């Protein structure tokens, strides 16, 4: 009778150990899958962060160029104003002197050239501003992607922690069950 009880207990113990082993294998597979996913997400996150840094540097560079172009634009406008003022003065004198007329004609040409330059600069400025706006938009999108990847990584880490805790609990339960059955077997 004692032998039968011991045999029954051993069979139960082996069954429990088999089940525990099978659960442990499942758990470890799930855990390593989650760890792999977390690692892949982390790598993707790093890449996205690098791209954001690069874009921020490009935006900064574009903004510097814009500032330079705006300064040039202001300088050209000032030159045009000077030219127009000089022309008006010449016209005001209403002199017939050929040298003055030549000077006025040259000034008019210069003013026309400057206006052309300003027009060209205006177009470039608008194009650069559009570019900067688009890049800032892309940056914001990238940052949103990074935040969602961050959240996904956090969720995976929480799942891993939960599974590890669950495994520990299962392990403790198994040990407790085995101890209980062994001590129970000794008394019967």
From Swiss-Prot:
Q: Which domain of life is it from?
A: Eukaryota
Q: Which is one Gene Ontology cellular component term of this protein?
A: extracellular region
- Cystine crosslinks: none
An annotated Gene Ontology molecular function: structural constituent of skin epidermis
Keyword Magnesium listed: no
Main location (coarse class): secreted
Q: Which residues form a coiled coil?
A: 1-181
* Compartments reported by the entry: Secreted
* A Gene Ontology BP annotation from the UniProt entry: biomineral tissue development
Per UniProt, the keywords (alphabetical) are: Biomineralization, Coiled coil, Secreted
Role: Involved in the structural organization of the epidermis. Involved in the mineralization and structural organization of enamel.
Give the multimer and partner information: Interacts with TFIP11.
Under PANTHER family, the record lists: GDOWN1, TUFTELIN
For this chain, the family text in UniProt reads:
Belongs to the tuftelin family.
Q: Any idea what this protein is called?
A: Tuftelin
The scientific name of the source species is Sus scrofa (Pig)
């Amino acid at each position: 009778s004692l032998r039968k009880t011991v045999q029954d207990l051993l069979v139960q113990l082996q069954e429990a150990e088999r089940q525990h082993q099978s659960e442990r294998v499942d758990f470890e597979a799930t855990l390593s899958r989650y760890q792999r996913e977390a690692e892949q997400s982390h790598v993707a996150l790093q890449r996205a962060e690098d791209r954001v840094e690069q874009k921020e540097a490009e935006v900064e560079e574009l903004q510097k160029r814009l500032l330079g172009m705006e300064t040039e634009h202001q300088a050209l406008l000032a030159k045009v104003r000077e030219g127009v003022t000089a022309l008006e003065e010449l016209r005001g004198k209403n002199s017939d002197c050929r040298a003055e007329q030549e000077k006025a004609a040259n000034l008019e040409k210069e003013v026309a050239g400057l206006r052309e330059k300003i027009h060209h600069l205006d177009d470039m400025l608008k194009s650069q501003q559009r570019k900067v706006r688009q890049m800032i938009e892309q940056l914001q999108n990238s940052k949103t992607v990074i935040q969602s990847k961050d959240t996904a990584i956090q969720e995976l880490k929480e799942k891993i922690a939960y599974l590890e805790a669950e495994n520990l609990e299962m392990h403790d339960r198994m040990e407790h069950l085995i101890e209980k059955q062994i001590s129970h077997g000794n008394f019967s």
